Amino acid sequence: MMPIPVNPTNASIQPQSLYDAWADLAWRAMLTEVNLSPKPGLVDRLNCGAHKDMALADFHRSAEAIRHWLPRFMEYGASCTRLPPESVLAGLRPLGMACEAAMFRATAGVNTHKGSIFSLGLLCAAIGRLYQLRQPIAAETLCATAADFCRGLTTRELRQNNLQLTAGQRLYQQLGLTGARGEAEAGYPLVIRHALPHYRALLAQGRDPELALLDTLLLLMSLNGDTNVASRGGADGLRWLQQQAAVLLHQGGIRTPDDLVYLHRFDQQCIERNLSPGGSADLLIVTWFLAQISQVNH
C-alpha cells in the first residue's frame, strides 16, 4: 500500500490534514472489519451472524457517522498535553458519548460500534497527544499512551460494588473478565503481542490480505476473554468458542480460499449457539488500524 500523501509544509500549523488522514484510516478499519467474510457469529457481507437486530448497512452508516468525530478526539488529545495522562479520560467521555449518540441516530438505535468508539477514541486522542508533543506515532507508542489514559480504570469501574451491577461489573465479578477496559488499561497486549505481529508476518509471507485478517481474527478469538461472548453464552460458551478457534489455527488456519469452508461451519455453529465475538471484532479493527498507521506521512 502506498503512503497516504499529506505533505504539510509546516506540520505545526497544518495538523488538520494529518488528523483527517488518520481518521480516514480508522474509518477504513471499521469498514474492513465488517466487510470481511465469513466471520463466525458476526455481521458480514454474507449474513447477520448471531444478530437479529443489525445488518451490514447499519455498520456502514455507523462508521460514516463516527468518522466525523475521530478528528475531534485527536484535537482533544493535542489540546491537553499539559494534563497528566490519567486525567485525559474524563474529558474524552463527553466526546465519546456525543459520538455514540451520532452512531445511534445513524442506526435508529442499534449498537454497532460502541466498543470501537471507545478504542478508536482512545487511540485517536493518543495520536493528537503524541503529535503535539513531537513524539513517535507508532503502534507501540499509541497503545502505551492509551494505557496511560486508562490507568486505574478497571479498579474504578469494575471492582466497585454497586447495588445494581452493570453487565461489565457482573462479568468481572463472576468470571474475572475485564473486557475492553482491561485491554485498554494494559496497553492492548492481545494486539501488540499477538494479533499485530501475526497479521504482519502473514502479509510478509505473501498471504492474501483478507485471508490473513480472517486468520488473525481466529487468533484473537482463541485468546480473548470476550465479554460479548460471555454475556451470551457464559463461561461455557466462551470456552467453547476459544477452543474452536484454537483448533482451526492448530489445523493450519485460513491459508487458502478452500479453508473458508471451516469458517462457514464455525459461523453456523456460533449462530446456533447465539454467540458473537464482538470484542474480538473490535480488536481486529484496532489491529488493522495500527498496521496501517505508518502510511500517513507526518
From Swiss-Prot:
Enzyme class of the recorded protein, top EC level: transferase
EC number annotated for this UniProt entry: 2.4.2.52
UniProt keywords, alphabetically: ATP-binding, Nucleotide-binding, Transferase
Domain of life: Bacteria
Gene Ontology terms describing biological process: prosthetic group biosynthetic process
Stored InterPro entries: CitG, TriPribosyl-deP-CoA_syn_CitG
A GO molecular-function annotation: ATP binding
Reaction it catalyzes: 3'-dephospho-CoA + ATP = 2'-(5''-triphospho-alpha-D-ribosyl)-3'-dephospho-CoA + adenine
Record has Nucleotide-binding as a keyword: yes
Recorded family membership: Belongs to the CitG/MdcB family.
NCBIfam families: citrate_citG, PRK10096.1
HAMAP family, A to Z: CitG (MF_00397)
Protein name per Swiss-Prot or TrEMBL: Probable 2-(5''-triphosphoribosyl)-3'-dephosphocoenzyme-A synthase 2
Originating organism: Salmonella typhi
Annotated gene: citG2
